[in-house]
Regions:
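The feature marks proteins involved in alpha-glucan
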Residues: 1-49
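Substrate-binding/active-site clefts of carbohydrate-active enzymes
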Residues: 31, 38-44, 53-58, 62-179
Length: 179
């Protein structure tokens, strides 16, 4: 009853099963932006980041127009990955490679990013690599052992949030977070 840690789609929460979907081909049209980003000098050029929740925009076109009008260089989007419930909020991620279905499909997210890139705007996807929520369907004791969390119980739980702390000493955890 665990969600596939590398799954790219899930049922609509609160259900948590991974869903196998056809990997539709997406035709990116952001080549100009991708080339420009190679020349970007982060320490020498001004950056202006608009942080926003996907839930704040009913229509992604409104977000693109707003960002363009105010000349933001980048947008930081959250929540992006699938999370279990509204009580945990967007930081209760249980499917790190699956875009949340609450705001559309994976194709919708790609389209939004593509449109932002086409107006010259970079995109940051906000996520939490520091800790993960405590729930049976997720990474917690994934194979019956502390596979992702710190095996030392005194170092496994974040004292303020009550979430599991990743075991950064594990090569598997590093690979998972960097994949």
């Amino acid at each position: 009853d665990k969600t596939d840690p590398y799954g790219t789609s899930t049922e609509m929460p609160p259900a948590t099963a991974s869903v196998i979907t056809a990997n539709a081909s997406f035709e990116w049209q952001d080549g100009e932006w991708m080339n420009a980003r190679k020349k970007f000098k982060a320490r020498k050029e001004p950056v202006s980041i608009y942080e926003t929740s996907l839930r704040d925009w009913e229509n992604p076109t409104q977000l693109v127009n707003y960002v363009k009008k105010l000349n933001y260089t980048h947008v930081e989007l959250h929540p992006v990955m699938e999370y279990l419930n509204e009580e945990d909020g967007e930081f209760g991620t249980f499917a790190y490679y699956a875009p949340t279905r609450r705001f559309g499909t994976a194709e919708d997210l790609k389209t939004l990013i593509n449109e932002l890139h086409k107006i010259g705007t970079g995109v940051f996807l906000d996520w939490t690599p520091a800790h993960f929520p405590r729930h049976e369907e997720g990474l917690e004791n994934f194979d019956g052992t502390p596979l992702y969390e710190n095996p030392d119980p005194s170092m496994a739980i974040h004292p303020m949030w009550g979430t599991y702390l990743y075991n950064y000493e594990s090569p598997m955890v590093k690979d998972f977070l960097l994949a």
